[in-house]
Amino acid sequence: MSNEAPEVEPHSKRRKKEASPSSSSGFLQSLPEAVAMICLARVSRLDHAALSLVSKSCRSMVLSPELYQTRSLIGYAEKFLYVCFCMPTDETLCCHEKINGNRSLNVLFLDCRSHKWHHVTSMRVARVSPEVSVVDGKINVWGGCKYKHYYDWGEVFDPKTQTWADMSIPKPVREEKIYVVDSWDVGSYYYLPSKSIWEKGNQDSKRSKDWCLIDKLIYSCGNDGGIYWCEAGELDWCDAVGIDWREVFGLEFLSKELRESRVVYFGGKMVKVWESYKIMYNISLNLEELLPETQLTNLTELGHNVLVFWEKLECCCDGFKILEIWCAEISLERWEGGEILGRCDWCHPILAINLLTVDPLFYHSMVLYSIPVDV
């Protein structure tokens, strides 16, 4: 008979056994379904993938629409930013271009809960790179088409009925305006849903590279890399008055990054070629002004903050080039004197692309769309 004391397992191993998936699953299964759903709803969405591996019942609850409804009802929905990048391959140089030479009627819908793409009802008019906005829960799409009639220029999608209609709204909803900035005509237009009419706004929109609206102020990125703002109502002013663009202070470091992002692809060779064309054909535009669609810079509204995207071309020690996509979150504070101060709350690269087999001059990345979603 042995007098040795029984071997005791280390504390860490006991903790692992106590927190095993089977015991966690059994605990949830012992609760009423509604209570278990509330417990899961309080868990961050970043942990849902791990939770779905615990058991079949946990996976079923994590994937159920009721979980996201519960998260919203009890105030635990989290805000995530979804960004659609143009990442051209050798076969597709730019996804803003036409598909096989044609505009497309197809529309894809991303379910932010399951991260799956679905086809929805096709548009009435084939388009490429249209502008999109949401008003009163309906998706307004306009531009990017060859149209014979004015009503072909824009159309509205109703997610509830899954149908498209022209942009003329028969009954007034509320006095909201949809602003459109034409980068070629260097001017603004706005659409009144309540009256189903278009009006010409101020044509002095020269600082327009990207736009977003926050707290009734319009923010835009200038060609010099600065971020500027104006009152929303100024887009309605007559041309003689002009738009009073004011710079957001405190973002000097960001201005340098955005300014360099404009010419990151051009290099000395391309600039020299273009300079010879300018002399030959008496052209006054610079190369970066001629190719605005190659720029990644994008402004996105995130609550009361603004997100800025830009690109950096880094050279590695082995001679290879890496394209980094950067993002910064800027908080905005309006002072008593009316000026606006910007502070960088967060700034990091979010994507790196190895340009081993791609000429950086012809690799044009851009942010197509970006939107914050509560999930």
UniProtKB/Swiss-Prot annotation:
<feature type="region of interest" description="Disordered">
    <location>
        <begin position="1"/>
        <end position="27"/>
    </location>
</feature>
<feature type="domain" description="F-box">
    <location>
        <begin position="25"/>
        <end position="71"/>
    </location>
</feature>
<dbReference type="InterPro" id="IPR015915">
    <property type="entry name" value="Kelch-typ_b-propeller"/>
</dbReference>
<dbReference type="Pfam" id="PF00646">
    <property type="entry name" value="F-box"/>
</dbReference>
<keyword id="KW-0880">Kelch repeat</keyword>
<feature type="repeat" description="Kelch">
    <location>
        <begin position="138"/>
        <end position="183"/>
    </location>
</feature>
<dbReference type="InterPro" id="IPR050354">
    <property type="entry name" value="F-box/kelch-repeat_ARATH"/>
</dbReference>
<dbReference type="Pfam" id="PF25210">
    <property type="entry name" value="Kelch_FKB95"/>
</dbReference>
<protein>
    <recommendedName>
        <fullName>Putative F-box/kelch-repeat protein At3g24610</fullName>
    </recommendedName>
</protein>
<dbReference type="InterPro" id="IPR001810">
    <property type="entry name" value="F-box_dom"/>
</dbReference>
